């Protein structure tokens, strides 16, 4: 089983062409729904009493929501604005609300999960919750600038507790205080994790494992509407694919990254979660074949 832990949110996203207000979002939401095309994930998250029923139904359609807690108060909210090129996002407002006092725990039915993804979340909570699983075969985490700047030591401690780290290029540099991505990855692996995947947005990603470097290009798109959740969709597809195969060989991890690139490309083609919610498995397989043709020579 795969368990995803992190945030479920109500997002306000402002792009040059459209503004979405209070739509379903959150790192764990994107990651878990992306993973759901490969396996049935369990979600550990919290929402408030204002969380719309229609969004709860969406989560229930794709995920096991036994670990979704409902607390009195408002749901975690995020408000962000993209520049005209959709390459820079400015955070306008973050309201933790119920997420700020949520005390997460792993439901009994999730404790035997052999795959665990710790989506962008408080590193202290992540490090604590990974210990509540009985026997994890493969664990992975993500982090962002906010946690690196406010809890860097805890981020490093979290990295020691997982098998793989997924992080974007600028945050890898910020975390390690290095300018070269190879040096970044080596330093992160030196902290105890086995695999490092550095996301480079539209330019794909780099996988590092021991002395191996595996670069993968992003899937080329003519139209991008909303980059929100692309990195979370990438990571969710990665661990969802691995959980479906129940294998973590380096060859399977490479394949999982291809699926990650593909799922990230679907996420950015529409606004919010629509790129994922409109998907069929046949769409994914078709794009993977297109990707294979694109990179073959």
Residue map of PLM features:
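Extreme N-terminal starter segment of soluble prokaryotic enzymes
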Residues: 1-3
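Short beta-strand scaffold segments in enzyme catalytic cores
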Residues: 33, 78-81, 204-208
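Conserved phosphate/ATP/ADP-binding segment of small-molecule kinases
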Residues: 137, 145-215
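Short, conserved phosphate/pyrophosphate- and ester-handling motifs at nucleotide-, phospho-/glycolipid
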Residues: 35, 168, 231
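A short acidic, amphipathic alpha-helical/loop segment
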Residues: 55, 125-132, 153-157, 183
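Alpha-helix C-terminal capping segments
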Residues: 30-41, 241-245
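Conserved phosphate-binding/catalytic region of the ribokinase-like
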Residues: 181-297
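Conserved N-terminal subdomain of the carbohydrate kinase-like
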Residues: 10-22, 37-118, 130-136, 285-297
């Amino acid at each position: 089983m795969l368990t995803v832990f992190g945030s479920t949110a109500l997002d306000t996203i402002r792009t040059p062409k459209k503004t979405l207000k209070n739509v379903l979002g959150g790192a764990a939401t994107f990651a878990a729904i992306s993973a759901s095309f490969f396996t049935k994930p369990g979600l550990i998250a919290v929402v408030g009493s204002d969380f719309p029923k229609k969004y709860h139904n969406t989560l229930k359609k794709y995920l096991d929501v036994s670990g979704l807690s409902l607390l009195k108060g408002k749901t975690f909210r995020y408000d962000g604005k993209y520049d005209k090129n959709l390459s820079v996002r400015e955070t306008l407002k973050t309201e933790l609300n119920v997420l700020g006092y949520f005390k997460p725990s792993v439901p009994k039915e999730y404790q035997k999960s052999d795959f665990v993804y710790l989506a962008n979340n408080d590193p202290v909570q992540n490090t604590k919750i990974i210990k509540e699983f009985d026997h994890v075969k493969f664990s992975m985490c993500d982090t962002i600038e906010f946690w690196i700047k406010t809890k860097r030591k805890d981020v490093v401690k979290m990295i020691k507790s997982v098998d793989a780290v997924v992080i974007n290029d600028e945050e890898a540099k910020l975390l390690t205080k290095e300018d070269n991505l190879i040096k970044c990855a080596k330093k992160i692996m030196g902290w105890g994790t086995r695999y490092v995947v550095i996301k480079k947005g539209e330019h794909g990603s780099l996988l590092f494992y021991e002395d191996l470097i595996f670069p993968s290009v992003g899937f080329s798109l003519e139209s991008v509407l909303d980059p929100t959740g692309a990195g979370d969709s990438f990571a969710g597809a990665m661990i969802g694919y691995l959980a479906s195969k129940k294998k973590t060989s380096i060859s399977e991890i490479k394949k999982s990254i291809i699926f990650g690139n593909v799922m990230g490309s679907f996420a950015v083609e529409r606004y919010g979660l629509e790129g994922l919610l409109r998907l069929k498995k046949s769409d994914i397989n078709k794009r993977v074949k297109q990707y294979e043709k694109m990179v073959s020579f």
